[in-house]
């Protein structure tokens, strides 16, 4: 197993390419856009947030979804139109509720472990991605939300992540620009933020230096495996269809992973959960002074923030179950702008760039990392809202699995050669 294809050039695909190239594999990366990180990894919330490791498989999620179903500006919006994909996903989601605490603890462990890889890679490759190590402040507007956060903190502690409660006065000291009245907060000093798009593109340049063949504008339409060889079909708008063969493949294709897994005989029940963001351009001194330096997560509105350099302020959130729909809806963007005006009144929101992306979410909220049914098929996908946070550690994990598989194959070949030698003497 020497040649490996990676399908998908977002954060998980590029980090996987890096982890494999560093282990000496010959890697080819396929991406359907002209550049890396042009879909889900383009303009997310920016948080590297182990403190947001709580999985969504909690009864309150279903209750809120039903309550907000007819509210177009709700943080969680479910299109009531049924589909087998949506029904099966929610059925598995509810079945996963028994593992709520276990999966939250495990996600926290992964998120903490991911930091050392991501920061080390950024330093080794000299990648500037507006990294800010100033912690993340979770804010709560009522006692109910704050009390639930206390229970979540106990689970995060089991996963190796300490965070502490703060009073409204302490919240103001942590982030003086935050306006409004709050019940309390939780502050995680070890969390950080950064620009996922800048990091992914910086690492994409690094993998090229390591010898990875990066193929952009490549619309992969089919992947097949006979367990010995992988065949990838690529459609082109201005050229005939091309066929490529490799020893193995790692599927890192975001919401398209479900389709490719089906072609390969695997079931990866990812649902595309749309999220929105706005990037506020801080074009004047008052806006720059009035924007927060510390990253925030508002529990009531489910919005997160990141300060990206001096002149950009990112606000992101919402979860929309509406199929493979990438439309940017004005009624979903307006609550984000209104939130900025309410919480940070000194920011001028005249210049705002809206964006929407599809999070690849598994029903149990845990990424699919590891081998498929075929011995030469692997997955690193389904990270949901924590792709940026978890990408480095899952890339390292899947690279270890691939390396172990390759070592086992080499051992089999050596063993077979030894046996043949004994027979012939």
Pin down the residues of each PLM region:
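Active-site substrate-recognition segment that forms the wall
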Residues: 44-47, 52, 56-95, 220-230, ...
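Glycine-rich FAD pyrophosphate-binding loop
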Residues: 22-42
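Short beta-strand to alpha-helix junction loop
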Residues: 102-115, 138-148, 173, 186-205, ...
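Dinucleotide-binding Rossmann-like beta1-alpha1 core, especially the glycine-rich loop
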Residues: 43-167
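N-terminal Rossmann-like FAD-binding beta1-loop-alpha1 element of flavoenzymes
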Residues: 2-29
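Helical element adjacent to the flavin cofactor pocket in flavoenzyme catalytic cores
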Residues: 147-159, 178-240
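C-terminal catalytic lobe of FAD-dependent flavoproteins
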Residues: 163, 299-300, 325, 341-425
């Amino acid at each position: 197993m020497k040649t490996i294809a990676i399908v998908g050039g977002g954060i998980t695909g590029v980090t996987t390419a890096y982890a494999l190239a560093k282990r000496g594999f010959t890697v080819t990366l396929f991406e359907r856009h002209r550049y890396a990180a042009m879909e889900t990894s383009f303009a997310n919330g920016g948080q590297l947030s182990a403190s947001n490791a709580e999985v969504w498989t909690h009864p309150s999620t279903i209750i809120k979804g039903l309550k907000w179903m007819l509210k177009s500006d709700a943080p969680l919006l479910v299109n009531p139109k049924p589909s087998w994909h949506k029904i099966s996903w929610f059925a598995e989601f509810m079945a996963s509720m028994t593992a709520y605490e276990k999966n939250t603890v495990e996600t926290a462990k992964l998120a903490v472990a991911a930091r050392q890889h991501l920061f080390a890679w950024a330093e080794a490759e000299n990648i500037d991605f507006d990294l800010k190590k100033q912690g993340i402040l979770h804010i709560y507007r009522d006692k109910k939300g704050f009390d639930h956060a206390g229970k979540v903190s106990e689970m995060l502690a089991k996963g190796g992540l300490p965070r502490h409660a703060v009073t409204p006065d302490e919240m103001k000291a942590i982030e003086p620009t935050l306006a409004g009245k709050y019940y309390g907060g939780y502050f995680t000093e070890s969390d950080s933020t950064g620009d996922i798009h800048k990091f992914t593109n910086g690492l994409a340049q690094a993998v090229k230096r390591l010898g990875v063949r990066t193929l952009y504008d490549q619309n992969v339409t089919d992947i097949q495996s006979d367990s010995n060889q992988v065949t990838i079909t690529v459609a082109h708008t201005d050229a005939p269809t091309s066929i490529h063969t490799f020893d193995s493949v790692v599927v890192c294709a975001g919401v398209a992973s479900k389709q490719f897994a089906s072609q390969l005989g695997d079931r990866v029940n990812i649902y595309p959960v749309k999220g929105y963001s706005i990037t506020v351009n801080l074009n004047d001194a008052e806006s720059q002074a009035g924007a927060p330096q510390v990253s925030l997560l508002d529990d009531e509105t489910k919005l997160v923030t990141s300060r990206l350099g001096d002149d950009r302020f990112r606000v992101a959130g919402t979860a929309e179950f509406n199929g493979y729909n990438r439309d940017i809806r004005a009624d979903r963007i307006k609550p984000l702008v209104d939130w900025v005006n309410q919480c940070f009144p000194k920011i001028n929101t005249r210049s705002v760039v809206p964006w929407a992306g599809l999070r690849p979410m598994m029903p149990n909220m845990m990424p699919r990392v590891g081998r498929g049914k075929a011995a030469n098929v692997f997955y690193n996908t389904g990270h949901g809202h924590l792709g940026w946070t978890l990408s480095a550690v899952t890339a390292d994990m899947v690279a270890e699995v691939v390396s172990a598989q390759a070592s086992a194959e080499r051992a089999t070949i050596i063993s077979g050669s030894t046996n043949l030698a004994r027979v012939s003497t």
